[in-house]
Amino acid sequence: GWIALPAVLLLGARRGRYTKDGMISAHPPSNIPFLALGAWILTVGWFGFNVMSAQLIEAVSGLVAVNSLMAMVGGTLTALVLGRNDPGFIHNGPLAGLVAVCAGSDLMHPLGALATGAIAGALFVWMFMVTQNKWRIDDVLGVWPLHGLCGAWGGIAAGIFGAKALGGLGGVSLTAQLIGTLGGVTVAALGSLVVYGLLKRFVGLRLDPEAEFNGADLSIHKVSATAERETNW
């Protein structure tokens, strides 16, 4: 997420997304079923890499699995309510919770994981709208709010809900989590700025105007993302 932010800023908004008179042009998702399919493939697969990150069957922790599920539930519920049934928020809500719980899934009490996921779901919905509508940063997939901000919140949440006072297993420091999270954010953002800055300077990041108008799916892969646009109306 923090690698994506400089890339999105350097790339710039889609043509016509923000007009000179301050209006925002709507660009609805091209395929809601595929959006849902992709999000839930990630959600199901998340349990594979998060629970099996120990890489040994003997080391698998049931707590990690339960906490992953609880965070997913929290993220889904808050995204459903705050996103007002928007499918983009509904299907990304569970991912927001799962992103956030990764850092502390082996430490937190399940209720702490639920709270972590719920806050992440709310954070994603709120910051996606702020990013797009107020700051006019055209992060189409919401990668920065979903992975960057929810991931940073998860790093901090591990230091909060991992404490014994809140039902966690302890052995974690909020100060250390803050420092580690800030360090990770800094390295990712600065590294991305350098790499994408060089790419923009010497190669270029955008398609040509005609290819942008037709869309990357049609221009690069020769398949339109929206079949209804192939009609003659």
PLM region descriptions:
Residues 1-233:
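Hydrophobic alpha-helical transmembrane bundles of multi-pass membrane proteins
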